[in-house]
């Protein structure tokens, strides 16, 4: 059931007011409301694209949602596990779907690299136990990647191929995922 014009207008006014004062409010936002039937009930943008920006927020503005993609990909993966399409603990399947995982090395404390002893599974990717990390969380990885100019946020696939921080399945580190849809 669509929103009546009065409710639609009232919601848009609330969104606009939230973005009026750039100092005490929010710079800009896009709000989309979808009914349980999947139909769009409201789509409205207000304010600017960021603090200090004069570019207006629009329904076509692109957002960097960073690690929120992990939640979306995790749900999608678990739906595929439920359907029997993916397996949580099959390293051969996971590395077959993401062949770049096969050649990853493990970064040792002395800065040298060693071969992986185990394959990487979907469960490891989803639970941050595959060995991936971020340079800003891990000094050893930062020291290794800095001289070669690797930047995990560049969008280049070669920069995503940083070494693992530990053998797959033998530790935990919040980090990038090889199944990251941004790459």
Q: Residue spans of the language-model regions?
A:
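Short, conserved catalytic-motif segment at the N-terminal edge
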Residues: 4-65, 85-89, 102-109
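Short Gly/Pro-enriched turn/cap motifs at secondary-structure boundaries
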Residues: 21-22, 113-116, 147
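Active-site helix/loop module of the DD-peptidase/beta-lactamase fold
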Residues: 64, 80-133, 137, 161
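Active-site-proximal alpha-helical segments within enzyme catalytic domains
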Residues: 124-128, 177-183
